Amino acid sequence: MLFKKYQFPINLFIIFEKINPVIYTSQVLTPNHYVCFIPSKWYYGLNLVLKKELFYNNSYLTDMSCIDTLKYDKFIPELNLLNNKRFLIYNIYYFYWIKVRLTLVQFSESKIESIDSVYKNASWLEREVGEMYGIKYTNKKDNRSLLLDYSRNEYPMLKDFPCEGYYEIYYDFFDNKLQYIKNEFIEL
């Protein structure tokens, strides 16, 4: 066996009992990894508990990302959290003392509460997800863009974003400025 099996902490089950999540785990592939689907209204409070609780205070947020479910046609009955929401946002946490990895998954439309006051590295991860998917964070301290132009409201990771983008951008050395040329889409 490659992994040493650690038990999921019982006090985390007690916290999860209130919010009624759907929890998945794999005993064969990665036995110390749990995936929990939670309602988005419990997102900030659950992050506070995971960071401030004495038993979990060595937890850290390792990754945050998003999935666009625009043309998602599969429906799993026990995952009734989708409810016509477009984005599936997931956070991956690691707990040092109990050697457990936890993934929190929530479904959201376009606004969720920021957790950058709880986890310091969440600011960068939220800026990245917000810029690529267009998700707005409430109570966020730093709303600067990372890669994209401030003047554009384009979100390149969405499924309805064209492959070639909306504009062709190049630097014109003769005029000494950026030039934007609108792409013309040709259907084959």
Question: What do these predicted regions represent?
Answer:
Residues M1-L188:
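Terminal low-complexity/charged segments
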